[in-house]
């Protein structure tokens, strides 16, 4: 086997050559190339005139000396038009029922069948055998067929519960194509003078027969790690729970895994990675409704579980909760505790400051910062006399936020533990403590747990960075995964600063 990175670079250059002159068809070309390199079938859904046949025609140039066959199905199409006419000579001289297959599907490496659902039962039955077993029964003989890629196309989906479903299930990759959307691309397409039938691929990039056969064996040697299997099983279980999810046969799952192996192999990796699972969005849908549903479920899998994003957030939540518990315990120990006075006949409970608090101006620290009067507040300065009067008689209390400016009106109360608590407009509270009595920084236990979590996050981010160099995965999906990881990292860093 060539060096993995050299192979990945070669396949990337091969795909770029095939994409020349085709606008907004890069993803389709790349997946069709992946299908061709792994011996799978593709279904293209879309209106007429959007280069479906040209995509299939281009794929012929990925291989040296590949033969292509294309045919437009109608309700009147006959097996002779697809699989070759009967040999009159063989029937006349030897009484043999044999087809002349030269130039027809049984001898083609690349096959394109347009309006596939209009094919009759005789064609469909033979086609199923060709796809499944890569064999063609020609009279009394069973011949191996060299087909590497079958591209079937239509502007409609097969009817449910029809005889076409068996063939549809064999189409592993399903792509929904539309007209060129971007203005600049549309103009370039209109003014392009490129001959669509020219070979755009240098001979040095084309795949030889020997390479193709060798790669088929090496693709099967790509491993499926346990954590990737768990993600696949999680997706399968989730789809089984959804009432509107499409039925996915065991055969389709197995063929999809080989496609993931091929994606890893041609990306220079020895094992399937979570990023390869994005390809399942083009393998598991059945119709428009299930297309959206599958994409949503895979998006959840990629941005929530594939790189342990949700697991890390769960751990972070537990750490933050533990930190709050420690803060509460510390608050109970260090908070300023006022003295409850007697007064059975008083209309309100009265309090006084501890005797050791004698300063004329008291600076009290918030156990946790609050936003008060549009300011992030960490401490409040009170006039001792004003605070004593409020403790004794109630009414309005004011203090200088962070010790600056004019004294501002505060929502202050004494809780059941006789601690002073200040609240913001959303009624979130923070206990007040004297300077020197409040613990500074994160507790060692919390700091260590956050450092371990950040280390695990960095490992996952490095893994993603190494795996995202995959030709067959659209960039917008990679962007969403990166954003999900960055969000987790930001939340960890925010917790470290508390």
Swiss-Prot record:
Activity control summary: ATPase activity is stimulated by ViaA.
InterPro entries: AAA+_ATPase, ATPase_RavA, ATPase_RavA_C, MoxR, P-loop_NTPase, RavA-like_AAA_lid, RavA_ATPases, RavA_LARA_dom
GO terms, molecular function: ATP binding; ATP hydrolysis activity
Coiled coil, from the record: none
Catalysed reaction, written as an equation: ATP + H2O = ADP + phosphate + H(+)
Class in the EC hierarchy, top level: hydrolase
Cellular-component GO terms for this entry: cytoplasm
Binding-site residues for ADP, renumbered to this chain: 23, 49-54, 196
Domain of life: Bacteria
Location of the protein in the cell: Cytoplasm
Keyword line: ATP-binding, Chaperone, Cytoplasm, Hydrolase, Nucleotide-binding
Self-association and partners: Homohexamer. Interacts with ViaA.
HAMAP family: ATPase_RavA
Function: Component of the RavA-ViaA chaperone complex, which may act on the membrane to optimize the function of some of the respiratory chains. RavA functions as an ATPase.
NCBIfam families: PRK13531.1
Protein name, UniProt field: Regulatory ATPase RavA
Organism from which the protein derives: Escherichia coli O7:K1 (strain IAI39 / ExPEC)
């Amino acid at each position: 086997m060539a060096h993995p990175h050299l192979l990945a670079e070669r396949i990337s250059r091969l795909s770029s050559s095939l994409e020349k002159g085709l606008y907004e068809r890069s993803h389709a070309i790349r997946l069709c190339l992946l299908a061709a390199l792994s011996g799978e079938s593709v279904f293209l859904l879309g209106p007429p005139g959007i280069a479906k046949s040209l995509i299939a025609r281009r794929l012929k140039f990925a291989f040296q000396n590949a033969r292509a066959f294309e045919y437009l199905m109608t309700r009147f199409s006959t097996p002779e038009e697809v699989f070759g006419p009967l040999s009159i000579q063989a029937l006349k001289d030897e009484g043999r029922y044999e087809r002349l297959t030269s130039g027809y599907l049984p001898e083609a490496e690349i096959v394109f069948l347009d309006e596939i659902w209009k094919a009759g039962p005789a064609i469909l039955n033979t086609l199923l055998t060709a796809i499944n077993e890569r064999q063609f029964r020609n009279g009394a003989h069973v011949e191996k067929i060299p087909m590497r890629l079958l591209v079937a196309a239509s502007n409609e989906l097969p009817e449910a519960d029809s005889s076409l479903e068996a063939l549809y299930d064999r189409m592993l990759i399903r792509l929904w194509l539309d007209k060129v959307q971007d203005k600049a691309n549309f103009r370039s397409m209109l003014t392009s003078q490129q001959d669509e039938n020219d070979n755009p691929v240098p001979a040095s990039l084309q795949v030889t027969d020997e390479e193709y056969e060798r790669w088929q064996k090496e693709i099967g040697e790509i491993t499926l790690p346990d954590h990737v299997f768990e993600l696949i099983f999680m997706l399968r279980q989730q789809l089984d729970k959804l009432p509107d999810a499409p039925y996915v046969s065991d055969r389709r799952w197995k063929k999809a895994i080989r496609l993931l192996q091929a994606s890893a192999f041609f990306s220079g990796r020895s094992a399937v990675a979570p990023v390869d699972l994005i390809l399942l969005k083009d393998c598991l849908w059945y119709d428009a409704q299930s297309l959206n549903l599958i994409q949503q479920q895979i998006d959840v899998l990629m941005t929530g579980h594939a790189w342990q994003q949700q697991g890390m957030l769960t751990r972070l939540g537990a750490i933050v909760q533990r930190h709050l518990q420690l803060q509460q315990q510390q608050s109970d120990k260090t908070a300023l505790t006022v003295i409850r006075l007697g007064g059975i006949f008083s209309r309100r409970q009265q309090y006084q400051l501890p005797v050791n608090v004698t300063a004329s101006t008291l600076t009290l620290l918030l156990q946790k910062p609050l936003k008060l009067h549009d300011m992030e507040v960490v401490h409040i300065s009170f006039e001792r006399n004003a605070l004593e009067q409020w403790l004794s008689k109630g009414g309005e209390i004011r203090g200088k936020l962070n010790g600056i400016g004019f004294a501002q009106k505060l929502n202050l109360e004494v809780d059941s533990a006789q601690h002073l608590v200040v609240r913001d407009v959303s009624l979130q509270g923070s206990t007040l403590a004297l300077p020197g009595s409040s613990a500074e920084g994160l507790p060692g236990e919390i700091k260590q747990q956050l450092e371990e979590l950040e280390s695990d996050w960095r490992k996952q981010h490095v893994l993603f960075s190494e795996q995202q160099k995959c030709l067959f995965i659209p960039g917008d999906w990679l962007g969403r995964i990166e954003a999900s990881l960055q969000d987790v990292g930001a939340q960890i860093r925010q917790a470290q600063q508390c």
